[in-house]
């Protein structure tokens, strides 16, 4: 198993407090990873600039700016385009997955989320970033 790079940061973005808390609890399985949170799309963009996360777990349906728009902006900016973005959403229609792909998302997970699967995905994506 490849250890995560010390100091790697994961940004969790969800407007639902319970969902955000659940994601934070899941990330406790990765104690070496720094976790920051945002509750809407505008706050997420601010945190992307401020905290330079290695990975963003991003809800789609949020106030102020959708996850689709956040992802587009992250991937369009040369300073942030290498940030890994994973959509974590209740939307699971093929058209939603396709739209997320068009925005540049690196992966897509439908809620409800299984803890071990999410932790393993985050661990693997962060390990891949250390090799690149």
Language-model segments: residues:
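Receiver (REC) domain active-site loop signature in two-component systems and cognate sites
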Residues: 62
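Acidic, metal-coordinating helix/loop segments flanking the phosphotransfer/catalytic sites
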Residues: 37-55
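Two-component/phosphorelay signaling modules centered on CheY-like receiver
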Residues: 17-36
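C-terminal output helix
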Residues: 113-122
């Amino acid at each position: 198993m490849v250890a995560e790079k010390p100091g790697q940061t994961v940004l969790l973005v969800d407007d639902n407090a319970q969902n955000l808390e659940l994601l934070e609890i899941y990330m406790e399985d990765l104690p070496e990873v720094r976790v920051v949170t945002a509750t809407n799309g505008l706050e997420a963009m601010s945190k992307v600039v401020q905290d330079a996360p290695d990975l963003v777990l991003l809800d789609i349906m949020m106030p102020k700016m959708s996850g689709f728009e956040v992802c587009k902006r992250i991937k369009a900016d040369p300073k942030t385009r290498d940030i890994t973005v994973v959509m974590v959403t209740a939307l699971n229609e093929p058209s939603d997955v396709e739209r997320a792909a068009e925005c540049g998302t690196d992966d897509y997970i439908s809620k409800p989320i299984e803890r071990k699967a999410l932790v393993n995905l985050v661990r693997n994506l962060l390990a891949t970033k250390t090799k690149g």
